[in-house]
A protein has these predicted regions:
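Metal-dependent enolase-superfamily TIM-barrel catalytic cores that perform enediolate-based chemistry
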Residues: 56, 60-62, 67, 136-146
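Acidic (Asp/Glu)-rich catalytic clusters
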Residues: 91-96, 112-124
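Active-site beta-loop-alpha junctions enriched in small/polar residues
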Residues: 41-44, 79-81, 104-108, 128-130
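N-terminal small/glycine-rich loop or linker at the start of catalytic domains
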Residues: 27-52, 124-138
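An N-cap/entry alpha-helix motif that binds or orients negatively charged groups
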Residues: 2-27
Length: 146
């Protein structure tokens, strides 16, 4: 990352943000950790917009740009979705761009295994929930309780 100028913490030789983010009335009750890490989901979540579909080369270029921007972790995709997603995730994990490469998976053995097989640093797992599912869980718990 670029060096931060002490009298102007809102800019460095690589980036600029609003100086108002550093105003005393804004920061007085904020206790920032020493290190903040950014986990970017563009390659997966970015495609969940109507009309947006990244091809293999798009995903590689986006990941390279994210790495160049200093992103710490990239959620590269969901290998179980398609062969292309599996290849992108695996290829990015092998390229050692700098950021850790994560995969996304449902809490299903096959999903998680495919993510692990892709060689990622970590797996983000989703557990779907709804009032209906929570209700079913409670009912099943009640049926098994003596």
């Amino acid at each position: 990352m670029g060096e931060i100028m002490s009298n102007t913490p809102w800019k460095s030789d690589q980036w600029l943000t609003s100086q108002w983010n550093f105003a005393p009335e804004v920061t007085k009750e904020i206790n920032f950790p020493e290190k903040i890490q950014i986990h970017d989901v563009t390659l997966r979540d970015g495609e969940q917009q109507t009309g947006v579909a990244f091809n293999y080369d798009d995903k590689i270029r986006i990941a390279e740009a994210l790495a160049e921007a200093g992103i710490h972790r990239i959620e590269a995709g969901m290998p179980v979705v398609s062969h292309q997603d599996a290849k992108v995730v695996s290829d990015l994990a092998k390229r050692n761009l700098g950021p850790e490469i994560f995969s996304f998976a449902r809490c299903m053995v096959d999903d998680v295994q495919r993510a692990v097989d892709a060689g990622v640093s970590g797996v983000v797992m989703e557990v779907p929930s709804s009032q209906h599912l929570i209700g079913l869980t409670q009912i099943s718990l009640n049926l098994t309780t003596p």
